[in-house]
Amino acid sequence: MKNLLFFSHNQKKILEVESIFDHKGVKIHNLRSFEKIKEPYESGVSFAENAKIKSSFGLKNFEIPCFADDSGICVEALKNKPGIKSKRFLEKFASNENAFEYIISNVIKTKNNKAFFKTAICLSITNNHHIVFEGKINGKIAIKPKGSNGFGYDPIFIPQGYEKTFAEMSIKEKNTISHRKIALMKLESFLFN
């Protein structure tokens, strides 16, 4: 495959993908290269199902092999929520800070700070050929948000084996250990090995 579509408008995700596929001889297109398109509603009950909904939609509409990701944070104190609704969870609060405060207060109340990030990437090659690659990183919720890098829940997530949040790490450092990186490396291995 010489051309692939990464079904995303998210500039930070796009940069992460481009850094991994740089110099691989594959042109990675993204939704920012095209006219604004309405993304499909993510009605799946798992990260993999939501990724497949998006990658299938991209393949159908652009007629090019497409991959998409669905990612989220799962917090034990919230019974592994927000999970697949991570983006919508942030949107229902007036600000990320309010969402973080809600999560942290539940972590303190339950005395359980365990959490993990999960990513599923689905590659849709044809209408009947879809392959899913997953990545997961365990960690814990910080007692207060720290750092200004990254996006989403990065200021409150401390990966296992580290003392700083994803948002305190450089983009390069985060991208060497992140859940998305793990899934993208599996995709890369499939495409190039």
Each predicted region: which residue ranges?
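Anionic-ligand binding patches
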Residues: 2-7, 11-193
